[in-house]
Amino acid sequence: MHIFDYSFLKNDLLPAQLVSLASNISALKVMSAFRKRENETAFRKLEDAAKIESIKASNAIEGIVTTDQRVRAIAGGSAPLNHTEAEIAGYRDVLSEVHVNFAAHDFRESDIRAFHAQMMRLANPLTDGSYKTDDNVIAERMPDGRRVVRFQPASAAETPEAMRQLVLAYAEARDDAAINKLLLVPCVILDFLCVHPFADGNGRLSRLLSLLLLYRNGFDVGKYISFEGAVNGRKAEYYAALKESSEGWRDNQPRYFPFMVDFLTTLYSCYNELDKRFASTNAGKATKKSRIESTVLNSFTPLSKADICGILPDVSPTTVEAVLGEMVRGGRVRRIGAGRASRYVRRT
């Protein structure tokens, strides 16, 4: 059986791309928290739109679709009219629970099984959150129409113990101060997908669990910009990363990094989209100067002017350059390098 071990996340030799993504996401998290305090009405509007998009997108990834009008109605509480809509409504119910009560839940078997039962109850009233009783496979359809086995998850016999071990490994890593929790989340989600503990609904549940773990660690952008929508928008990259990282999993040689990079890239895109939508509401009291200052001062790694422009796409390079100059002259940040190679970091 697979051995779950996240101690590698304490390694100082983690890929620079992962460390940079995690650092920039953390800086953007601080910015969004500031905005939320100052603009509650604007964030409520974003939350309503994101909920509809999340319900639509997460189900669409699995081929569960209906009209936009019906998705909006179901998101608003309407009863489902058929089996497809029952599956969509089940996702709606768990998503609402995660949004409202995430602090009361965690990555533990009781919650995972309860979420699955709630997600499936309208489409299959007999579902009680039990793990699969038959082995399942992840198949891929080839261009000539043939199906080939892409991945063999944990067997039905292995699943109960695999889930116990996965939950214990997560709890151990969660309580380890040396492990970056933002890096831990995609590793746990990858392992959940590789166990594939239920007969149906594993993909949709994995996205709900992703939100739960992100919210519990303070990364709540998924409430305001649909994380599921971002996954659906780059579905090919998601499946490619999942395929690459799951190879070797049964032999205890998983390659976590491709899935981690894809997961954090998706999350980073949500924070960038939040920045653009926030700017479009024209409701923010935060000045462009204060946003630039907050971005630099809350980053754990040096940022270039281009990095800051990527984080704040509505702010011109000229404005970024002017504010950085002021911060350097004021002694708040120091400049590393020169010219286009310049990076800026908070003075400690």
Question: Residue ranges of each PLM-predicted region?
Answer:
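FIC/Doc superfamily catalytic core
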Residues: 1-348
